[in-house]
Amino acid sequence: MDDRAFTKLTDYLKQIPAIEGSIGHGADDEGRWWVKFTINIEHPLAWQTVQELGHVLNYLSVNERLPTSFQPVSPPPYMNGGPDEFLSWVIESHDPEFRPGTCAKWLEGRLPNPVSDLEQWGME
């Protein structure tokens, strides 16, 4: 899969306040893709970010599920360190027809809008 296929999704994820650092991506030979990034666990919106992404990507509704999964990934903590340094998050697509740009559109339609505006996240 061409790197340009990921631009809309990675650009969108970079706007989410709790997501920091670089965003990796790739795809297998069958076209199933993944995007990997870090959520700053000290950010006040860290767990709300996890909740929002988990809701849309893992279980939007009983009748409307996306062919994606959102989950944490980590190397062995005993060999590396704690979650502030080595915990990452990955979005994986299980259907080659579901493209990264389509995923971005689903997130845009369901996460706070504009996603970069802290007030839209309902911070108190």
Each language-model region and where it sits:
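Structured alpha/beta or helical-core interaction and ligand-binding surfaces enriched in interleaved
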Residues: 1-124
